[in-house]
């Protein structure tokens, strides 16, 4: 009898479940995966090399475009590395604003993840619900920075500006009548902080909705339980971080273990899984959304009571005020120099890591004393996770490959960078 050979299948790069531009070369025995070989680099934009020809501040917008669903957290790692090299202090209010927006970004990321993951597995409704909530958070981004996605809001030494006192409101148009407008603008009457607080007061109920649809859903559990199991030892060996590591039962979160900004003053818990399968990672991320809500509420409470500066008073780094610029020639020259030549960073190297929604996002920065980085290395969490795909998918059905890609929460901007 003739021997049955394995056959090879190309999964992606234009597959809807490939999360962008992933090309998987699958070796199959019938419908069982024997080997999964990820091919990356289809979204490579040479970010690390581009940064070498840009001033330090000009590379901030590049960070937004790495993991383009967790924009501000990428910026955070980068500005922390610059601040380490410069040795400057950040005003306490700016630290709280950064932590607040890190958590807003974490929720943004997890909403995208739960919607896309559920859609891949076959649950349509969650995707629509998740995007309903994301819309409000995108409006928060827009109110504070003027952009819905690529905010470029963090700066070395603080943030671009303080939180606005008024929330932008919807205006009448062909598709929105006055009655619909009044309902949409109902919670936009106050400041940005009021709007964020209102969102996080409503949000736990929204998370309950997602859990009602998924957590005890028979089909959801059949598709996730026991799929892509990673043991705690193996998770550490493969360099997994974030929810991928915590799902395997290892309590590691940089916000607790190596606190930065004001996370050491925040009261929150680290959710940890037991079995290390896709279902545990799902539960960990859902609980992370609840913990982010707790942190955000603490930040809002503090920010209400404590006004103050949001940018360092070190004039080598901070641009002069608009008012000063229009009345003082020296300040105008200083502003011009700062945005053309940029500031010079002392010689040295620094590594700064933040707890990104996907794992540990690190920036290794080398300076030779010039106004541009000598070398910028980005440690993307998704890169290590994707390398574990082969091991996680072996022995599973081809349909489970989709579940495993979903649970890894991969975005190719940061993998290919």
From Swiss-Prot:
Signal peptide feature range: none
Protein name: NADH-quinone oxidoreductase subunit D
Family designation: Belongs to the complex I 49 kDa subunit family.
Matches recorded under NCBIfam families: NuoD, PRK06075.1
InterPro entries the record matches: NADH_Q_OxRdtase_suD (IPR001135), NADH_UbQ_OxRdtase_49kDa_CS (IPR014029), NDH1_su_D/H (IPR022885), NiFe-Hase_large (IPR029014)
Main function: NDH-1 shuttles electrons from NADH, via FMN and iron-sulfur (Fe-S) centers, to quinones in the respiratory chain. The immediate electron acceptor for the enzyme in this species is believed to be ubiquinone. Couples the redox reaction to proton translocation (for every two electrons transferred, four hydrogen ions are translocated across the cytoplasmic membrane), and thus conserves the redox energy in a proton gradient.
Subcellular location: Cell inner membrane
Catalysis: reaction(s): a quinone + NADH + 5 H(+)(in) = a quinol + NAD(+) + 4 H(+)(out)
GO cellular component: plasma membrane
Membrane topology according to the record: Peripheral membrane protein
GO molecular function, one term: quinone binding
Top EC class for this record: translocase
Annotated organism of origin: Paraburkholderia phymatum (strain DSM 17167 / CIP 108236 / LMG 21445 / STM815)
Lineage: Bacteria, Pseudomonadati, Pseudomonadota, Betaproteobacteria, Burkholderiales
């Amino acid at each position: 009898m003739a021997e049955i050979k394995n056959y090879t299948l190309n999964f992606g790069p234009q597959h809807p479940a490939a999360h962008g531009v992933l090309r998987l070369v699958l070796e199959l025995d019938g419908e069982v995966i024997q080997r999964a070989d990820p091919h990356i680099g289809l979204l490579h934009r040479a970010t690390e090399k581009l940064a070498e020809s840009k001033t330090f501040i000009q590379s901030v917008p590049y960070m937004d475009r790495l993991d383009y669903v967790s924009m501000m957290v990428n910026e955070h790692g980068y500005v922390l590395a610059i601040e380490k090299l410069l040795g400057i202090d950040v005003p306490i209010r700016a630290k709280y604003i950064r932590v607040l927006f890190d958590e807003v970004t974490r929720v943004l990321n997890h909403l995208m993840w739960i919607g896309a993951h559920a859609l891949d597995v076959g649950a349509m409704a969650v995707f629509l619900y998740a995007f309903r909530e994301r819309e409000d958070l995108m409006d928060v981004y827009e109110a504070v920075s003027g952009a819905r996605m690529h905010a470029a809001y963090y700066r070395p030494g603080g943030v671009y500006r303080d939180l606005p006192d008024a929330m932008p409101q919807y205006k009448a148009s062909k598709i929105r009548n006055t009655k619909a407008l009044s309902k949409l603008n109902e919670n936009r009457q106050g400041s940005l902080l009021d709007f964020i607080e209102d969102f996080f007061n409503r949000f736990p109920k929204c998370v309950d909705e997602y859990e009602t649809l998924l957590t005890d859903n028979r089909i959801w559990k059949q598709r996730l339980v026991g799929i892509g199991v990673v043991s705690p030892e193996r998770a550490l060996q493969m360099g997994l971080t974030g929810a991928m590591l915590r799902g395997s039962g290892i309590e590691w979160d940089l916000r607790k273990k190596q606190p930065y900004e004001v996370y050491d003053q925040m009261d929150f818990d680290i959710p940890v899984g037991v079995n290390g399968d896709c279902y545990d990672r799902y539960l960990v991320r859902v609980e992370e959304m609840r913990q982010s809500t707790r942190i955000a509420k603490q930040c809002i409470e503090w920010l209400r009571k404590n006004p103050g500066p949001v940018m360092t008073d070190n004039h080598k780094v901070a641009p002069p005020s608009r008012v000063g610029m229009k009345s003082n020639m020296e300040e105008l020259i200083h502003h011009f120099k700062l945005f053309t030549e940029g500031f010079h960073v002392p010689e040295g190297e620094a590594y700064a890591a933040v707890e990104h929604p996907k794992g540990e996002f690190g920036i290794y920065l080398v300076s030779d004393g010039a106004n541009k980085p000598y070398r910028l290395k980005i440690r993307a969490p998704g890169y290590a996770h994707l390398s574990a795909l082969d091991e996680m998918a072996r022995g599973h059905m081809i349909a489970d490959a989709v579940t495993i890609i979903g649970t890894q929460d991969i975005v190719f901007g940061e993998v290919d960078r």
